Amino acid sequence: MSVTLDLSRMAPSMSKEGGDAPKALINLSGLTRAQLLVALTESGVAEHGKAKMRATQIFRWMHHRGVTDFALMTDVAKETRARLAERFTVSRPEVVERQVSKDGTRKWLIRMAPGIEVETVYIPSVGRAGALCVSSQVGCTLNCSFCHTGTQALVRNLTAAEIVAQVQIAKDDLAEWPSDKEDRLLSNIVFMGMGEPLYNLGHVADAIEIISDNEGIGISRRRITVSTSGVVPQLEALGDKTQAMLAISLHATNDALRDVLVPLNKKYPLEDLMAGVRAYPGLSNARRVTFEYVMLKGVNDSPDEARALVKLIKGIPAKINLIPFNPWPGTDYVCSDWAAIEAFGAILNKAGYSSPIRTPRGRDILAACGQLKSESEKVRASAMRKLSMAAMAGVLDDDDEAAA
């Protein structure tokens, strides 16, 4: 299989007054091994006949050992390291803020570029294992009414390097370099952070290939789950390109209600969504789809809704995650009573569907499901307020001088 790589597309120009715009350094962390081989060959960095070996060496340094400086790649020739540093980078984005919940959940606010921030969350489990919830976009276009992220307008897609960087930063903080395959703290990846992954499938697929590569981080694709609100035309491509586990952000059993909770449903209604799920590549009892269902008091939590859910997903190898609603500033929704959640789950269990109730984690640091929202908007709003105040101050100064 041949791989082509448009290096100019991956490194957008940066403006420079009075001359040609210099090219930004390409972050090699966002290249699959095949893409890395092409980059080294096309740039002329790798010695003749050694490009494949160099690609594997550099990949292992980035993703097995977690280095952020070419100078530390001691089994790469010194001259080659110098040429790499002239053209590429393996640096991390800036961690603006790190928070740790009383339950051990960790949240990082990561600045990918000026004004471009995302949140990433590590959720520890009962044992050593834990899941990392990564973002695929800055903001979101879907406007799900119960989701805090949906109140932030989409800024842009994240690149594969920016998605992978979230995993690298978590491993930095958890002190999990080198990437041992056993007894690891970070054992699962879930694309359930900010954004709709299927609206950024190319970069998401590359990131999954990098994260799952056994020469590096080596997290099995069966431990990587991609959650979508239901971009039906991309479901088959997701399965074919990534072999990742599928999760559907469902939350309603009829189109009228789902149109309100998940407006994307107006474009891809439940009948189309269920057909797409049934056709998902690799779906089986061993590779079940997960339906996510947020429990909203008086909205979607009745016994009748539970029975309708059983009917809706009949014949699909599935489990249902019942998610107690996590409040956020400004929402009108309220979490279902615990008794109502348990009664809902009992109906699903009786029908043969596993329906665990997700334990709320990280609520005290707004790191729980549906609570993520970057500080980008706040930063931009603050900057605008400062500019306005400065402008007003300038007007007042002018007025004072005129009066004098």
Curated annotation (Swiss-Prot):
Q: Any idea where the Radical SAM core domain is?
A: 126-358
**Intrachain S-S bonds:** C133-C369
What is the annotated signal peptide range for this record? none
Tell me the Pfam families matching this sequence.
Answer: Radical_SAM (PF04055), RlmN_N (PF21016)
Sites where the protein binds S-adenosyl-L-methionine: G195, E196, S227, S249, L250, H251, N326
Catalytic activity, reaction form: adenosine(2503) in 23S rRNA + 2 reduced [2Fe-2S]-[ferredoxin] + 2 S-adenosyl-L-methionine = 2-methyladenosine(2503) in 23S rRNA + 5'-deoxyadenosine + L-methionine + 2 oxidized [2Fe-2S]-[ferredoxin] + S-adenosyl-L-homocysteine; adenosine(37) in tRNA + 2 reduced [2Fe-2S]-[ferredoxin] + 2 S-adenosyl-L-methionine = 2-methyladenosine(37) in tRNA + 5'-deoxyadenosine + L-methionine + 2 oxidized [2Fe-2S]-[ferredoxin] + S-adenosyl-L-homocysteine
| Cofactor remark | Binds 1 [4Fe-4S] cluster. The cluster is coordinated with 3 cysteines and an exchangeable S-adenosyl-L-methionine.
Q: Which cofactor does it need?
A: [4Fe-4S] cluster
Report the EC number(s), separated by commas if there are several.
2.1.1.192
Family annotation (CDD domains): Radical_SAM
Q: Which residues form the active site?
A: E119, C369
Annotated Gene Ontology MF terms?
4 iron, 4 sulfur cluster binding; metal ion binding; rRNA (adenine(2503)-C2-)-methyltransferase activity; rRNA binding; tRNA (adenine(37)-C2)-methyltransferase activity; tRNA binding
Provide a GO CC annotation, any one: cytoplasm
The protein's role, per its UniProt record? Specifically methylates position 2 of adenine 2503 in 23S rRNA and position 2 of adenine 37 in tRNAs. m2A2503 modification seems to play a crucial role in the proofreading step occurring at the peptidyl transferase center and thus would serve to optimize ribosomal fidelity.
Family that this chain belongs to: Belongs to the radical SAM superfamily. RlmN family.
A further note on this protein reads: Reaction proceeds by a ping-pong mechanism involving intermediate methylation of a conserved cysteine residue.
This protein is called: Dual-specificity RNA methyltransferase RlmN
Q: Which organism is it from?
A: Caulobacter sp. (strain K31)
Source taxonomy lineage?
A: Bacteria, Pseudomonadati, Pseudomonadota, Alphaproteobacteria, Caulobacterales
